[in-house]
Amino acid sequence: MARRPARCYRYCKNKPYPKSRYNRAVPDAKIRIYDLGRKKATVDEFPLCIHLVSNELEQLSSEALEAARICANKYITKVSGRDSFHLRVRVHPFHVLRINKMLSCAGADRLQQGMRGAWGKPHGLAARVSIGQIIMSARTKDSNKDVVIEGLRRARYKFPGQQKIIISKKWGFTPLNRDEYIAKKTNGEVIDDGAYVKFLSRKGNLEANLQQFPNYQYSA
């Protein structure tokens, strides 16, 4: 039987139905890669962060997430190179979609009249997103802003409903604003930790803090 159109599962009507010991034989999600581009780039290399934000309460199928990921990655890679950005899909398809299969193909001499609204068997996976939730994020250099915005704009057409593209005030994927990050970096209160930063703790062993944050300006 062919895959049912995703418009049948667009809205969040029921409770979340994740995979569990009671819900078995669930097919794998189509999307398997959630981080793309130059993942090992330090925080200082990619200061600009751009988000694709959902404007509706809906369900996004794993096929749509995979299509959007491929679309954004292909465009940005072709225009500016694969090492010019770091793209991350921020939602995961944990909700199991169900289908009650009934014969309606050419081989059936009549349409099968089954129970309406029956429970059904696992059919696919979808991510449940709310209004204002981030679907995809990309960090890059300031000079590459227009290319990343265009890549996310093209990926937006793979999803139902409305989405908006937002340029974040934060420094990369960190929770710090740009001026706040520069001030803390100058003062030695943060150090690079992959795509994020590690903060100086005000508690704990003083020697360990001194070793980890040697540039911090301790006041007497």
Curated annotation (Swiss-Prot):
InterPro entries: Ribosomal_uL16, Ribosomal_uL16_CS_euk_arc, Ribosomal_uL16_dom, Ribosomal_uL16_euk_arch, Ribosomal_uL16_sf
GO biological process, one term: translation
Domain of life of the source: Eukaryota
GO cellular component assignments: cell surface; cytosolic large ribosomal subunit
Pfam families, sorted: Ribosomal_L16
Membrane-spanning segments: none
Keywords: Cytoplasm, Ribonucleoprotein, Ribosomal protein
Record-linked Gene3D superfamilies: 3.30.60.300, Ribosomal protein L10e/L16
Keyword Glycosyltransferase included in the entry's annotation: no
Record's subcellular location: Cytoplasm
Predominant place of localization: cytoplasm
Molecular function terms, GO-annotated: structural constituent of ribosome
Presence of keyword NADP: no
Protein purpose: Component of the ribosome, a large ribonucleoprotein complex responsible for the synthesis of proteins in the cell. The small ribosomal subunit (SSU) binds messenger RNAs (mRNAs) and translates the encoded message by selecting cognate aminoacyl-transfer RNA (tRNA) molecules. The large subunit (LSU) contains the ribosomal catalytic site termed the peptidyl transferase center (PTC), which catalyzes the formation of peptide bonds, thereby polymerizing the amino acids delivered by tRNAs into a polypeptide chain.
NCBIfam families reported for this sequence: PRK04199.1-4, uL16_euk_arch
Subunit organization: Component of the large ribosomal subunit. Mature ribosomes consist of a small (40S) and a large (60S) subunit. The 40S subunit contains about 32 different proteins and 1 molecule of RNA (18S). The 60S subunit contains 45 different proteins and 3 molecules of RNA (25S, 5.8S and 5S).
Family: Belongs to the universal ribosomal protein uL16 family.
Name of the protein this chain belongs to: Large ribosomal subunit protein uL16
The organism of origin for this protein: Candida albicans (strain SC5314 / ATCC MYA-2876)
